[in-house]
Swiss-Prot record:
Transmembrane segments: 34-59, 72-92, 105-129, 150-172, 189-214, 247-267, 280-301
Source organism of the structure: Mus musculus (Mouse)
Protein name per its UniProtKB record: Cannabinoid receptor 2
Name of the gene this protein is made from: Cnr2
Gene3D superfamilies associated with the record: Rhodopsin 7-helix transmembrane proteins (1.20.1070.10)
Main location, first listed in the record: membrane
Length: 347
């Protein structure tokens, strides 16, 4: 793609004909536009509702919102909620309705999409680190991961995500650098830098969860040596198998949802893309929306404490609607440890 081109909302004139360079990126056929509109609308709505429900459950529970683990999960839900709304709306407006904005507005939109997805991956990394500390340092976990430190980590992560994502809006555009084959006004060197940053985040997630699984395996092996006659084999392997299933699911979802789009972004840096590849990238991009839709199930709905808080909320709303007031019973049994800590203790 050639260098800087003017894409202001007021189209230029070339021999009396309207000229809009943005149309070079609007390559979907009518059938593909319908598919994109339907898929983005349905997945965006479902993902937004799921993540909004998780946010409400955590923030409405005084017990949950005080725990660092659930602060990280609420950050993930917030990022995925914003990603669902911002990405779905802007993606449909651009590819289906061919909406064209001024350079600044367009860069603001694409920066917002980038920020929400970057913050989502950053929240996944903080959640992975939290689980690592919880499993590997259970006696000192509460002293290491306080609510204040969790909030500081989240603030740093969100500020860094915003700073990196809005660099094009602050002037890092393809003028005169070569423009990306996939994103208008975005230079290839910025795209390369963002890909490297995301690769670092994913490497941190994979390494952290891999180390957690290895540590759990050693923990189970140690128990087996000291309690071979007292602890049945199935019970000894319970933590190992449970963590392996959970971490396998986490990594499989990340790989399926993110790798196709990231691979095509990297491919665009070294070669010229055909329209067919660009069309494939448009649909691969929607897999990131699938990730935002699946995250609440993996990280929130599988948590016993969140399910208990959700049940309490439903009981409260039911009584409220029946005219009995919002007061209900106390939230489920109080626990001073997170789900991961409980797994370690039962093993």
């Amino acid at each position: 793609m050639e260098g800087c081109r003017e894409t202001e909302v007021t189209n230029g004139s070339n021999g009396g004909l309207e000229f809009n360079p943005m149309k070079e990126y609007m390559i979907l056929s009518s059938g593909q536009q319908i598919a994109v509109a339907v898929l983005c609308t349905l997945m965006g709505l479902l993902s937004a509702l799921e993540n909004m429900a998780v946010l409400y459950i955590i923030l409405s529970s005084r017990r949950l919102r005080r725990k660092p683990s659930y602060l990280f999960i609420s950050s993930l839900a917030g990022a995925d909620f914003l990603a669902s709304v911002i990405f779905a709306c802007n993606f449909v407006i651009f590819h289906v309705f061919h909406g064209v904005d001024s350079n600044a507005i367009f860069l603001l939109k694409i920066g917002s999409v980038t920020m929400t997805f970057t913050a989502s991956v950053g929240s996944l990394l903080l959640t992975a680190v939290d689980r690592y500390l919880c499993l590997c340092y259970p006696p000192t976990y509460k002293a290491l991961v306080t609510r204040g430190r969790a909030l500081v980590a989240l603030c740093v992560m969100w500020v860094l995500s915003a700073l990196i994502s809005y660099l094009p809006l602050m002037g890092w555009t393809c003028c005169p650098s070569p423009c990306s084959e996939l994103f208008p006004l975005i230079p290839n060197d910025y795209l390369l830098g963002w890909l490297l940053f995301i690769a670092i985040l994913f490497s941190g997630i994979i390494y952290t969860y891999g180390y957690v699984l290895w540590k759990a395996h050693r923990h189970v092996a140690t128990l087996a040596e000291h309690q071979d006659r007292q602890v049945p084999g199935i019970a000894r392997m319970r933590l190992d198998v449970r963590l392996a299933k959970t971490l396998g699911l986490v990594l499989a979802v990340l790989l399926i949802c993110w790798f196709p789009a990231l691979a095509l972004m990297g491919h665009s840096l070294v070669t010229t893309l055909s329209d067919q590849v660009k069309e494939a990238f448009a649909f691969c991009s929607m897999l990131c929306l699938v990730n935002s839709m699946v995250n609440p199930i993996i990280y929130a709905l599988r948590s016993g404490e969140i399910r208990s808080a959700a049940q309490h909320c439903l009981i409260g709303w039911k009584k409220y609607l029946q005219g009995l007031g919002p007061e209900g019973k106390e939230e489920g049994p109080r626990s001073s440890v997170t789900e991961t800590e409980a797994d370690v203790k039962t093993t």
